[in-house]
Amino acid sequence: HTLENQEKSDYLQAVKCLFESPAKTGIKEPSFLGTASSFVSTKSFSKRSADTLGSDEFSFGTNGVNTTQGTNCVIDGPFANTTLRMDQVYGIDYYDEYCLSREFNQTAFTFANQSYVDECYVKETYNEANFCYVDSPHSCGHLATGGTMENQNASPGDPIFFLHHANLDRLWWDWQLANLSSRLTDMSGQLIPPTFIMEQNRWLTPSAAYLDYDGDAGNDTTLNHVLWMAEIIPNKTIADVMDLRSELLCTEYIVAEK
């Protein structure tokens, strides 16, 4: 299915509406509701996405340029001259305003191409596939777009973030489909990354206030892990969202017509 221009416009206007709506959380809350976004926005994004990069009203805008507002600011498309206020360093309150920015990196684009996706597709376990997808398609999508997307804490400020993560969700579903009977229950991974990763990214170790409700007894992620939905909908578990065909998700990824 290929979206008509009106459908693209409707989607982009809906995103702008979210930008302009009052926040659901206070300034002291996390900058990004990761589980809510990946569960709600990501599951519907690829069905309603507009053309990715372009300067017209039906696209997401192009590369950034230097302006008086900042470096590499996006000045075309529906999100031209967007001002962001999300914290740029995890755990540190940030009250300054800055522009939505992009700085395309062609080398990173190369490392996110189909050949690297294919390498991940043949991995046998979730643990192997997860590390593979995170390493190339995921990280390089952020680095290739650059600017706001390159900053882990601020990256949800670029609407391309949700397009990118929707595609990752699609890739994961494609991987699951290759062996659905076992991969609908294949889950693993640490809840808290190794210390060197925490220090490298200047992340703070979560306190008991964040860990006492997650549903996992130790540091290993299980199907019982609770996904906090920020009161948008009732909290769910990973088990609830493993099957894209379920009544809860009821989602299908459709290949666009060429």
Residue spans for each PLM region:
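Intrinsically disordered, flexible peripheral segments
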Residues: H1-K258
